[in-house]
């Protein structure tokens, strides 16, 4: 998903290379994935991505995972991205930075039927589960925990018994 976002953005002039040259970078803020079905092993699939909206400080990007042969949709994803200044880590105004040019790529009418994600609120019962030690291989180009490692750390919070019971 993240690589397809990069390819899509790069082809339109606001990928990582162009941003890095301007001392900016993209930061993934939220990601929601809903799969209705899973392609079986060795099945080809198509991953489509598009920008839903561009706001001042963030943009919404959606994804569709489908069969190239039948068009069957396996699932959708929604993501929220912010652009930051790499030096001071402050958000960049997307409209000033690109003079609304990103808006020309927005497809607000493209269907993405999964619910829009909101902010994750603190749990009422915030019981400590465990400390997670970050290692060099956990960190991405921006100095953040990379997305795959983040998901691995979350998955590792649950026991094997939990997964067997809730598969």
Kindly give the residue locations of the regions a language model identified.
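Structured core of small recognition/catalytic domains
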Residues: 144-167
């Amino acid at each position: 998903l993240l690589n397809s976002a990069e390819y899509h953005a790069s082809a339109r002039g606001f990928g990582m290379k162009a941003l890095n040259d301007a001392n900016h970078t993209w930061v993934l803020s939220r990601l929601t994935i809903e799969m209705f079905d899973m392609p079986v092993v060795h099945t080809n699939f198509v991953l489509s991505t598009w920008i839903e909206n561009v706001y001042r400080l963030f943009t919404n990007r959606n994804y569709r995972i489908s069969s190239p042969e039948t068009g069957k949709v396996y699932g959708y994803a929604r993501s929220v991205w912010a652009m930051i200044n790499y030096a001071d880590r402050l958000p960049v105004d997307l409209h000033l930075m690109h003079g609304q040019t990103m808006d020309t790529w927005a497809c607000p009418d493209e269907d993405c039927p999964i619910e829009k994600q909101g902010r994750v609120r603190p749990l009422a019962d915030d019981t400590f589960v465990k400390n997670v030690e970050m290692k060099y291989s956990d960190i991405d180009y921006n100095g953040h925990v990379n997305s795959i490692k983040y998901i691995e750390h979350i998955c590792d919070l649950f026991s094997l018994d939990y997964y067997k019971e809730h598969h």
